Amino acid sequence: MIIPVLDIMNGMAVSGKSGKRETYIPLKTIFHPSSNPYKIANALKDASAKRIYIADLDAIENRKPNYDIIKKINQELPVMLDSGVNTVNKAEEALEIAEKVIIATETLQSIDDLIDILDSNNKDRFIISIDIKDNEIFSKHLDMDIEDIVKKMGEINPPEIILLDISRVGTEKGVDHAIIKKFLKLDSSLIIGGGITSKDIEELEKLGLNKFLVGTALHANKLSI
């Protein structure tokens, strides 16, 4: 399953590379002539998308979130939302507007906070995103390496885990299969993102993986839903 990716900033769908948000520009996509996220999401639904990954870049950077737009999209297409959730209160707000809420290592302050959030609601409504940059765990607060994270995820056993290589986002360079293989021992369902190519999908499906986050290649018509 290809899960379309939509980054939203200042009310618009935007695109960029390698997580350098200050350089992001309005998204150009084959699905709609505008950068209106609601219209793009509806076009993705018409193209047979079953769910959509949305990163609210304003919320992640502690600016005014785009929750009205996201709530509207969620009424048309189930949203997996990354809005920088790192507290129970933020999780509750996000759960009101999205089908599932992402807790990402980028903004998570501690593993204790993660456990508190997971215990606060139905565990199935949360997805943990393991953010990776330059082959290391990307986090503003956590001091953990990949082996530490794999061990901790085995203990927590979340239903779904995203492995997102931020350094490869928007590059279409493919993903690091060696890192992915370290997580295959977990019982959690894995969703792979960051520079995904058709070759990646073909090879990763052989490992039993079947959920992929795709943005740039999808919007440029290099991959289809």
Predicted stretch roles:
Residues 2-8, 52-54, 79-83, 101-103, ...:
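Hydrophobic faces of well-ordered beta-strands that scaffold small-molecule active sites
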Residues 18-62:
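N-terminal beta-alpha supersecondary unit
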Residues 64-71, 141-150, 172-181:
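Charged helix-capping and loop-helix junction motifs
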Residues 43-94, 177-179:
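N-terminal active-site wall of soluble small-molecule enzyme domains
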Residues 32-45, 87-92, 142-153, 201:
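Short, acidic/polar
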Residues 97-113, 162-168, 193-225:
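Glycine-rich phosphate-binding active-site loops on the catalytic face of alpha/beta enzymes
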Residues 48, 76-77, 93-102, 120-126, ...:
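Glycine-enriched alpha-helix->loop->beta-strand junction motifs that scaffold or abut catalytic
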Residues 8-30, 98-169:
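Conserved anion-binding
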